[in-house]
């Protein structure tokens, strides 16, 4: 049996930046671009990996209607293709399991939408294994380790080929990985792409950069054929985020559709050549947000106490991780150290 082409899309966060109209228009344009990728690559199945919406406790009326209309138009223009939407943490009103019914898909689309369109599926309150062997796990079913174990046990003996979820795969411990029985896992949730090839774990990242945590980094839509990622399509449509340091700014001229931070040492920032270069960049890029940040030689923590940069930074980091996050930090650190060996 020939493997289906599957287009996989990470977090979108419609309604971000306090429901900014400007951002909404950018995201609408990219949504249209994604439909062209679906058609051009003969994708029979389309999977959104969660966090289609941003503000979990309220959906802006304009945002909700725009997204509903875009999804409706997309699935109606492609009636023989299967469209699948996983619920992410931002799509739920509350992090309590008993409240999982209160989610963005139920409010914006409702069960009537699925009855009207038989080629769209929203996975919000229970896992689902489809006829292709794709297992869909909404956010709640990976965040609770006990619930995760029960879910995998429930599908034991079934033919699972791929798993799609909304989780930080970097924090999965060896027990969770063993439960996968070697099946690849593709996930949203973490905005920066991350891969563990050995265990077949793929955090595919967000569909678009959303803030300066995504600085100097590209985002993609992925084409899968079977379990293999056969192509990545770079997002060149929406805003990008860039950060440059000191002498790097002298290689810059024009920016396009982005936000820029220029980090300059305090002892350099008032030198004539830096002042003139910053003026030139702002003059030549009137529509671009360019922020200049003066850097100190020391790092500053929340209490505005200077850190001795000659001390062991690893020990400093270890001692400043919050207790409730330390186990996750240890898991991530061990994986990084293992990969660096």
Task: List the predicted regions and their residue ranges.
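Metal-dependent catalytic neighborhoods of phosphoester/phosphodiester hydrolases
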Residues: 18-20, 50-71, 87, 92-114, ...
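Active-site neighborhood of phospho(di)ester-bond hydrolases with catalytic His/Asp-centered motifs
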Residues: 8-10, 45-51, 82-89, 121-126, ...
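Accessory, non-catalytic peripheral segments of nucleic-acid enzymes
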Residues: 225-341
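Active-site regions of enzymes building and remodeling cell-envelope glycoconjugates
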Residues: 119-121, 132-134, 160-161, 177-185, ...
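Conserved beta-sheet core of the metallophosphoesterase superfamily
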Residues: 168-232
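Conserved catalytic scaffold of divalent metal-dependent phosphoesterases
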Residues: 84-178
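Short, conserved loop/helix-junction motifs that constitute active-site signature segments
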Residues: 74-79, 155-157, 176-181, 253-255
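N-terminal active-site segment of His-dependent metallophosphoesterases
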Residues: 1-65, 148-160, 335, 341
């Amino acid at each position: 049996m020939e493997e289906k082409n599957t287009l996989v899309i990470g977090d979108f966060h419609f309604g971000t930046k306090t429901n900014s109209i400007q951002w909404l228009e950018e995201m609408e344009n990219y949504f249209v671009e994604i439909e062209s990728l679906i058609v051009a690559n003969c994708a029979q199945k389309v999977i959104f990996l969660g966090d289609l919406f941003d503000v979990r406790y309220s959906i802006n009326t304009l945002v909700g209607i725009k997204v509903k209309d875009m999804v409706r138009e997309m699935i109606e223009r492609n009636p023989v293709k299967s469209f699948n939407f996983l619920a992410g943490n931002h799509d739920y009103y509350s992090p309590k399991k008993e409240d999982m019914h209160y989610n963005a898909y139920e409010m914006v689309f409702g069960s009537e939408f699925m009855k009207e369109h038989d080629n769209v599926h929203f996975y919000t309150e229970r896992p689902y294994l489809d006829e292709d062997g794709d297992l869909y796990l909404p956010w709640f079913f990976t965040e609770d380790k006990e619930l995760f174990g029960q879910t995998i046990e429930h599908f034991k003996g079934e033919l699972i080929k791929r798993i799609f979820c909304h989780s930080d795969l970097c924090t999965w411990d060896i027990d969770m990985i063993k439960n996968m029985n070697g099946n690849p896992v593709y996930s949203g949730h973490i905005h920066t792409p991350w891969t563990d090839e050995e265990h077949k774990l793929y955090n595919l990242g967000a569909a678009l950069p959303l803030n300066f945590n995504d600085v100097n980094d590209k985002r993609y839509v992925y084409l899968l054929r079977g379990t293999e990622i056969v192509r990545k399509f770079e997002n060149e449509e929406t805003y990008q985020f860039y950060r440059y340091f000191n002498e790097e700014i002298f290689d810059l001229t024009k920016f396009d559709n982005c936000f820029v931070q220029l980090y300059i040492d305090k002892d350099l920032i008032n030198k004539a050549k830096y002042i003139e270069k910053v003026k030139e960049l702002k003059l030549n890029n009137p529509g671009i947000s360019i922020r200049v940040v003066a850097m100190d030689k020391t790092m500053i923590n929340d209490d505005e106490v200077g850190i001795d940069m000659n001390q062991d930074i690893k020990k400093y980091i270890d001692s400043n991780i919050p207790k409730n996050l330390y186990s996750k930090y240890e898991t991530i650190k061990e994986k990084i150290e293992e990969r660096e060996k």
